[in-house]
Amino acid sequence: MMLFKLSIKNITKSIKDYAIYFFTLVLGVAIFYVFNAIDSQTVMLNVSSSTSEIIRLMTTILGGVSVFVSFILGFLIIYASRFLIKRRSKEFGIYLTLGMSKRKISLILFFETLIIGAISLGVGLALGIVLSQLMSILVANMFEADLTKFQFTFSSSAALKTLLYFSIMYLIVMIFNTIIVNKCKLIDLLHGNKKSEKVKLKNPIICTIVFIIAVIALSYAYYLVTDVFGTSPLMNTISGILIPIALGCVSTFLIFWSLSGLILKIVMHLKKYYYKGLNSFTVRQISSKINTTVFSMTIICLMLFFTICIFSSALSIKNSLSGNLKDLAPVDIQFSKLQESLSKEEKENFSKDIIEDYNTTAKDTLQRLDVYKYLKDVVDINTYRVEEITLKDSFGDQIEQIGKDYPTLAYNVREDLVKLSDYNRLAKLYNKKELTLKDNEYVIISNYKMMADIRNISLKNNTKLTINGKDYYPKYQECQDGIIELSGSATNTGVIILPDNALEGIHPYKNILAANYQADTKEEKENVEDIVSTIINNHFNKDTLLSYNTKIDIYASSIGLGAMVTFVGLYLGIIFLISSAAILALKELSESTDNKERFNMLRKIGTDEKMINKALFNQIAVFFLFPLLLAIIHSIFGIEFANYILKTMGTESLLSSIILTAVFLVVIYGGYFLVTYYCSKTIIKER
C-alpha cells in the first residue's frame, strides 16, 4: 500500500513529465476506438444491401489495420516509457541509495503504469465515444445515407477490443520497465544525465561523396515514380515498383548520415553566424546527439512522407470515385450481350439453350425472361469491331512517337465503333450532347483524360481511318466527352462514332440496352432491382450470357471503396503523424533533461533568459523541421505518382486535399512542437 501511495505521489509530482506521454496515450486510445466503432455507427444508416456488404468489408479491413496500428502504438508507448525512466533516473538512484530494492522500484513503476494506463484508457474511451458520434455524420456523408434514425451509440465490441489491445501493450511496458530497472547500475542512475555523446567530426570528403551518391540515387527514384507506365520498364511490375521505394529509404538514411557530418563542418566555417549569439552553443547541442538520431530521423522522415501522401490521396479518393457518378451512371440499368459468332470450341463448351439465346438481342432475352416489363426509356444499340481499325490504326503516322512514349498500350486491340444514329439516341437518354457528321467524318468520344490526351495527338494531325475502302477524317481535333456503357469511373478509353452507312453490312460485336426502372422512389427502384437481378442471376450461364450493370451497384461499390480507402488512410495517417511527432517530442524532452546543467551554466555566466529560450527554440525547431523538410520533398514526387493514379478515377487536382493535409500537419505536428518547447523550457529552468 505504501508503494501504491508513493506511485500516486510521484505521478502528481511529475505531472509535467507525463503530459506528452498521457496526451499521446489518450489520443491513441480515442482514435483506436473511433475507427473500430464504425460498424456500430453504420447500423443506424438506411442503406441498400450492396452498401451494407461494402460496410462489412470495410470494418473487416479496419480490424486488420488495427492490428498493425497496435504494434505502432505499442512501440511508441515503450519508447515513451524509456524517456520517463531516463527523466527520473536520479530519483531511482536515490531510492537505491536509501536501501530500496530494485524489485520495489519495479513495483512502483508497475503501479504508475497501471494508474496512468487506467486513466488514459478511461479518458481516451470517453473522448473516443464523443468523437465516434461525429464519425457517424462523416460515415453518413460518405455513404450518402439517411441519418433520420441517428441516435447515440456505444460500441461494446470496440471498447472491449481497445481495452484488450492496450492492456496487452501496458503489460509489455511493465515487463520492459522491470528489465530496464534490473539492468541499471547505481552510478548510471545518479549521474546518467551528466553523460553526453562525444561530438565526432566525420570526414567531410567521405560525407560529401556519400551525399552526392544519395542525391543521385534519390533523383533516380523520383524519376522512376514520375515516369510510371512510361518509358521505364521497371515500373511495369510490382517488384519494379519496390525499387524506387528501396532507393528512397536508403537514400534518406544516407542523406541524414552525410549531413550530420557536413552541417557542423559548414557552420563552423561560417564564423560570423557561428559566433553570433548562442549559435555555437545551439550547433554543438544539436551535434552532441546527431550520431544517434540518424536512424530515428530516417524513420520519422519516412513516416511523415507516408502521412502526407496518404492524407493527400485518401482525402481525394471519395470525390474521385463518387464525384462524377451522375454522369457516369445516368440510367438505372444497362444490359449487354456479345454478338460475334461463336467458334467451334466455344459451342462445345456452351449448352444448347445458351447457343440459341446467343444470336438474339438483349431485348429479346429480356422479353423471354419476363424482365422487359420492369423497364422504361429503353434504348438499345450495337457496337462494331473490324480488323482494319485497331488502336494502332487510330494513331496513324504518330504511332512511332506514341509507341516510344507509351510502350505499354495494347496497340493491336480492335477499336469500338458505333453508328451516329445509335449514339445520338443513347446520348439523348444520357443527357449528353448529340453529334452531327458529314459522310466522311468521325468523332472519338472518351472521358479517360490520359487516353484522350494521347488520342488528341493523332486527331490534331487529321489522322484518317479507312473502312471498306472509304476514308474518314476527324471532325474535331480532340476527343469529345461521352460514354456508351455505365461505369463507376471515367475509364472510357475511346469509342469511334461514324456515319451510319460506314457500318452497314458489318456484323455487330456487342448489343447494349440501357433503360430506367418502372419505378419512381428509391425504395421502389431497389425492389425492382432485386427482382430483375434475381431473374438474370438465376438464368446466367444456364440459358443466357446476358450481363448487366446497375446504377445502385455502381454507386454502392464506388462510394464504398472511396470510404474504405479514406478511412484506412485517415486511420494510418493520423497514427503515423502522432507517432512521428511524439517520438520527436520525447527525444527532445530527453535531451532537455540531459542538457539542463549546460543551460544552468549559461545562466551562471550571465546569459539572459531570452537568449536561452531562443537557443532552445532553435534547437527543437531544427529537429522537428529537418525530417519534415525532406519528407515534403519526397511527397512532391509521391503525390505526383498518386495524382497519376487518381486521374484514372476522374480526379485531376489534389489541391484541396493538400491544403487539408497541411492543416493536419500544422495542428498535430505543430501542436507537439509547441508543447515540446514549453515543456523543455520548464525542464531547463529546474534547479
What role is predicted for each listed range?
Residues L325-A563:
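Nucleotide-cofactor and metal-assisted catalytic machinery
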Residues K16-F23, V34-F68, F83-K86, I94, ...:
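Peri-transmembrane interface segments
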